[in-house]
Amino acid sequence: MSEPFFRPGSGPAPGHPTAEPWRRRKRWYSPSDGRAGTARSHLPQRSTSHDGVCSRICAFVLCMVALQFLMTSAMAADESPLREAEVANFMLGNGMEVVVIPDHRAPIVTQMIWYKVGNADEPPGKSGIAHFLEHLMFKGTKKHPSGEFSAKIAEIGGEENAFTGSDYTAYHQTVTPESLRTMMEFEADRMRHLVLTDAVIVPERDVILEERRWRVENDPEQLLEEEMQATLYQNHPYRIPTIGWMHEMEQLNREDALKFYDRYYAPNNAILVVAGDVDAGRVRQLADETFGTLPRGPDLPARVRPQEPEQNTKRIVALTDPRVTVPSFQKSWVTTSYGTAEQGEAEALDILSEILGGGTRSRIYQELVVKQAIASSGGAYFNGRSLDPSSFTVFGSPRGEAKIEEVEDAIDAEIRKIIEFGITDVELEKAKNRFVRSIIFARDSQSGMAGIYGAALATGDTAHDVEAWPLRIRAVKAAEVQAAARKYLSPDRSVAGYLLPRESATSGDKSR
């Protein structure tokens, strides 16, 4: 599964790591400056944005600053229960779901439209069409020509963004409350009335092809992650990159775009989330008058995708590249997700990732960076928010004269300790506190709240599930964390990836 990149030029989007603390992300820690950062490397990880011109390095810097602020603030947060938001959840007559999250602390409002379609729903041979449609949604309708929507948002001093993931595609704007009707009118118009001609399709296809060259072909880390995903998932469409395979993207045409748009872009396949200085009654009225006038789209079948066979092999992916200056290692496993888990399993995996590699207090950091001093970075993350089975990943980079094999062995040893001996009650409670405080901090943000609800509902959860999430985290037991590690983190079902400078690789380096 994947995480969205963001569309630059208008501030952090809900798809960007600095604005998505509600998503559990890859973390890395550097002893040289004492700061912590977050990033989606799958992204994480395999999602993409509207225009794709943001430097990955710049994003990393933004992430590091953001998480330092997040952790400082969150650790000082009140231990009291989360305040109850007066969240309203209702359906329009045409099947569009609406969530309203009032927050009257500032005169702004965030509108998000989540379509329950992502790259995992693409027809075979049409990879990248979901992301392509995201681009095309900015190209105009008969009523509003290309660029008018964005110009209007800029005129009123608002922000906008869009992102594509494996399970959803989302568009959002942040404006003043009096501009909400205008935003709804524009979004409703392009939901069903997009104009797609060859004059629009061909140039924009060139744009996404160039985006792939820039984002993936020129980035060894992205190339490795793409190969890792394709190896980790043997049958499920999560193995396909969100941006698409180049040879299939080159063949995308107007007919492909129209079929995808007509099938999935409809009110009964969308979720409207409005957070900010609004009340539910007013939002219901505006939604009825704008989105409510649209006809239903086709009634779609359940989102049943090809599932993974039982995995029973250790697989290795190694990429050597002269552009790599610092080697790195990561290892991934297919796991359950919040969309597929038995009761408590996904929560246990979230706590496992926190204890194993979730920060400077984690086992990986303390053992590899502080005690042994063999790693410059290291951590773990669980990509739990997906419709189908997801993944758990550990990672690290060697420090000084240390070898990448030493880092891998040390991380494997920490996993074995948890599998064999479990975790202590003290570290369990500390991990829960850190995790719940990060949720509290996320809920203090309009876009954070809108993102929490949108992603959850788009992947099969309910508004009640969102409200109960912190309580479910609090209920995790030490034995459940150990059981999750034992069940999912077997070395015989893993994919290990190595990113290496060309001169350091030998034919026998990664044979074990």
Swiss-Prot record:
Annotated Gene Ontology cellular component terms: plasma membrane
Location of the active site: E134 (proton acceptor)
Keywords: Cell membrane, Hydrolase, Membrane, Metal-binding, Metalloprotease, Plasmid, Protease, Transmembrane, Transmembrane helix, Zinc
Cofactor(s) it depends on: Zn(2+)
Binding residue positions for Zn(2+): H131, H135, E211
Any one biological process term the GO annotation gives: proteolysis
Organism: Sinorhizobium fredii (strain NBRC 101917 / NGR234)
Region (Disordered) residue spans: 1-50
Protein's membrane topology: Single-pass membrane protein
UniProt cofactor note: Binds 1 zinc ion per subunit.
Family under the similarity heading: Belongs to the peptidase M16 family.
One example GO MF annotation: metalloendopeptidase activity
Protein's name according to its UniProt entry: Uncharacterized zinc protease y4wA
